[in-house]
């Protein structure tokens, strides 16, 4: 299995071998253009990472951890005097009720994470194993 993200298209693709299983519409950070460089920049990282863990008690329904920062990210941030940040996830919507959930659909609202709806994060939770590669493109 693998995940491929196209930030500019707001799409995430789930593959099994080379077979496309599903395409997801996604939301990104409030500052979506460019690679994440430091904590608080609200950017979604770009590059090759992996799913490195999961949180069943997420504030966003469920969440899958992305292995950001990698060594390159840490070196680049340190060279510029910054913390690279962390806690980049694929997650669902905030644990709110009713009409508030509609606010988060079809807009960028995260702090750099990749968001899908709650039904989709449940699908991904069951389909994607820890160690699955995720390639995040511009």
Question: What would you call each of these model-derived segments?
Answer:
Residues 1, 28-52, 71-76, 99, ...:
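N-terminal post-signal-peptidase region of extra-cytosolic proteins
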Residues 1-34, 138:
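Intrinsically disordered, low-complexity
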Residues 6-8, 45, 60:
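Short, basic and Ser/Thr-rich N-terminal targeting/leader segments
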Residues 53-138:
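Exported/periplasmic cell-wall-interacting domains
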């Amino acid at each position: 299995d693998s995940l491929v993200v196209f930030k500019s298209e707001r799409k995430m693709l789930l593959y099994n071998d080379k077979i496309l299983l599903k395409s997801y519409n996604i939301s990104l950070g409030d500052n979506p253009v460019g690679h994440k460089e430091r904590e608080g920049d609200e950017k979604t990282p770009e590059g090759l990472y992996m799913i490195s863990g999961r949180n069943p008690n997420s504030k966003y329904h469920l969440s899958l951890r992305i292995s950001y920062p990698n060594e390159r990210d840490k070196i680049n941030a340190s060279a510029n005097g910054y913390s690279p940040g962390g806690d980049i996830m694929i997650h669902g919507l905030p644990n709110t009720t009713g009409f508030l959930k509609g606010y988060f659909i079809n807009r960028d609202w995260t702090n750099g994470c990749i968001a899908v709806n709650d039904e989709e994060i449940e699908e991904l939770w069951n389909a994607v194993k820890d160690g699955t590669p995720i390639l995040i493109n511009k």
